[in-house]
């Protein structure tokens, strides 16, 4: 078994979510309004009870509101928001409770199918609860019986959002304020997996019966070319094919096409649901065995086992007239069908680095 990319293991530092940042800055601004107290840092309690302290970049009054800001620290996670300035503006209001507003750089929901209603600011349920819990606790401590209006902003968020799946999900104008635990765990990719689930939900809610889950840009381009699918029906799954297959147990979209590079599809064929090289490897002896099943002689099998990459193995098989691409897709199809409900029609495409189709299975 060989990995096709080299990964370097090292201790990694956790960070804090945009939801934690919004909670800290909202609390600091509200405290300034109610008590006049201004601090360089603020403590918040995360959903599982851990108390963390977050440094503030500023906290001041501005007209009838207070605003406070902090720099998003995602630790060692490759988060698009790492280093961004997130700030909250808080106003007092007569009505009890907390009203949320999307400020500059925070998106608004424009399509049904997400956990938030159309027209709502893209501040997810757990961050909303974190902010509300902290502000209502502060109100109780201060003897304040009114409510709060909280506007969350992310500097440069509208441009940063173009690097996320928000536009495809129908979240327009900026980023989402996210988090379930309050902590960003490096390479846990929980936000990415959540966006995969959201993409499926949005496509299903909006009446699309055929979705294509793709590992990258080349496979997306292939699906556009083959099926002319709209953006909303293209699910950017990356390495997380398991996130797609398992979610279809809850949301059984009638037709699913899986499309990816030959190497990644060979991992799926071997039963892997995380296709990243950290978690699964190319099994060249298995590729040789599949080639043998469709006529490869001993010399070709040995050449496949000795290949440097799956692409080289595929090229060797192709030169010998052995349809290894189709055979790998067939095994991937069998595995995918074993995970999703029986009523979901599944098909699999494997492509080369240029987007050319090198194998397919389950295609009518």
From Swiss-Prot:
Keyword set for this entry? Cobalamin biosynthesis, Methyltransferase, S-adenosyl-L-methionine, Transferase
Give one GO biological process term: anaerobic cobalamin biosynthetic process
Report the superkingdom from the record.
Bacteria
Name the pathway. Answer: Cofactor biosynthesis; adenosylcobalamin biosynthesis; cob(II)yrinate a,c-diamide from sirohydrochlorin (anaerobic route): step 6/10
What is a GO molecular function of this protein? cobalt-precorrin-5B C1-methyltransferase activity
Catalytic reaction equation(s)? Co-precorrin-5B + S-adenosyl-L-methionine = Co-precorrin-6A + S-adenosyl-L-homocysteine
Q: Which Gene3D superfamilies match?
A: CbiD-like
The EC number(s) attached to this protein equal: 2.1.1.195
HAMAP family reported for this sequence: CbiD
Family of this protein: Belongs to the CbiD family.
Q: What is this protein called?
A: Cobalt-precorrin-5B C(1)-methyltransferase
Please name the source species: Pseudomonas entomophila (strain L48)
Q: Which gene encodes it?
A: cbiD
